[in-house]
């Protein structure tokens, strides 16, 4: 559920990742120091800005694109990247589109990407750099060894952040079962979850850019984060003001700047608490997060439980008969919920002692 721009960037990087035919062709052009301008798409919008050149209409191969890049013009690939359609073309985008790029090749690439919304790749002849444009996204591809170093460094940072998050969440677990949670405890847990997810998002971009070289990083990442984002969303559902859309709240929290996310007031405002003293305000969870930890409890049953009992405390104090009366819960499931919550509480208290 990360922001759309990040999702779009990841999808672009997957197309250009090491190990793909496209990336092999780009690396060949880079090593030859010829420079190049490549458009990934053949829609009507693109063909409107294409002038001159000649039709190739041949199967894509890294060696073909390398040879064609020796000519000055742009190369047009089909949308599925399987064919080279045109070579040595001139691109004539709308000159009124603003761009802050300097070289002719990069200015053209930026304008074409903004005008058509397709991926345009500019390979610098002098600086030996591959730059990718799409809409208002600009990304410079880096060497795999540099990316691996950055990814490993980010993983080490993530490990420390996850350790802090675990302590904060364990504390929240105990307070929830004792029904003495304050807004400060909740906002701290949500803040820590968001900080972890921001590092995760950064590492995911590195993994996309590394392609098949990022497998080990991906495995380590999955082992570290497990259900962090899901639990964070359940926290929002547990504590946001009634009738607020939790997806919208999560989106707002993601949009908070890196500096402002350190301030709990920004998070509490997104959750619907304005001008409320965080440390002194007690609040009870609805119970989504704890119920999600009980095996084989569908989302509809969780919704029905929260609708009927309002708070986790009430669900825990309900008898088997009370639970049985809730829609979607029979005798067996009532027992599973009651026993599941009891075991969860015991486990959390035991873990805290050690």
Swiss-Prot record:
Kindly state a single biological-process term from the GO annotations of this entry.
DNA repair
Give a Pfam family name.
Answer: DisA-linker
List the SUPFAM superfamilies hit by this protein, alphabetically. Answer: RuvA domain 2-like, YojJ-like
In Gene Ontology terms, what is one molecular function of this protein? adenylate cyclase activity
Q: Does the keyword Transmembrane apply?
A: no
* Reaction(s) catalysed by this chain's protein: 2 ATP = 3',3'-c-di-AMP + 2 diphosphate
What cofactor is needed?
Mg(2+)
Q: Which family, according to UniProt?
A: Belongs to the DisA family.
In its UniProt entry, what is this protein called? DNA integrity scanning protein DisA
Q: Gene name?
A: disA
């Amino acid at each position: 559920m990360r922001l759309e721009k990040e999702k779009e960037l990841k999808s672009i990087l997957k197309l250009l990742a090491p190990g793909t035919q496209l990336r092999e062709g780009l690396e060949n052009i880079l090593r030859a120091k010829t420079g190049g301008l490549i458009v990934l798409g053949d829609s009507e919008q693109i063909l409107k800005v294409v002038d001159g050149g000649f039709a190739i209409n041949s199967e894509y191969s890294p060696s073909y694109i390398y040879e064609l890049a020796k000519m000055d013009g742009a190369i047009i690939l089909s949308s599925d990247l399987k064919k080279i359609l045109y070579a040595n073309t001139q691109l004539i985008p709308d000159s009124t589109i603003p761009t802050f790029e300097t070289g002719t090749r990069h200015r053209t690439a930026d304008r074409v990407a903004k005008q058509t919304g397709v991926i345009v790749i500019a390979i610098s002849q002098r600086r030996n750099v591959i730059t990718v444009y799409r809409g208002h996204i600009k990304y410079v591809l880096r060497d795999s060894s540099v990316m691996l170093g950055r990814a490993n460094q980010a993983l080490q940072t993530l490990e420390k952040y996850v350790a802090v998050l675990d302590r904060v969440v364990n504390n929240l677990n105990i307070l929830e079962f004792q029904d003495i949670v304050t807004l400060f405890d909740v906002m701290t847990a949500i803040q820590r979850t968001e900080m972890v997810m921001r590092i995760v998002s950064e590492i995911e971009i590195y993994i996309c850019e590394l392609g098949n070289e990022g497998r080990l990083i991906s495995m380590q990442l999955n082992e570290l984060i497990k259900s962090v984002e899901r639990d964070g969303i359940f926290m929002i559902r547990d504590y946001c003001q009634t009738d607020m859309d939790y997806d919208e709240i999560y989106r707002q929290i993601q949009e908070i700047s890196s500096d402002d996310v350190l301030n709990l007031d920004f998070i509490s405002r997104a959750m619907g608490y304005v001008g409320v003293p965080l440390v002194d305000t007690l609040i009870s969870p609805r119970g989504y997060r704890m119920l999600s930890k009980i095996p084989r409890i569908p989302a509809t049953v969780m919704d029905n439980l929260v609708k009927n009992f309002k708070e986790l405390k009430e669900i825990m104090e309900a008898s088997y008969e009370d639970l049985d009366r809730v829609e979607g819960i029979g005798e067996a499931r009532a027992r599973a919920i009651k026993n599941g919550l009891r075991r969860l509480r015991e486990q959390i208290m035991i873990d805290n002692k050690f």
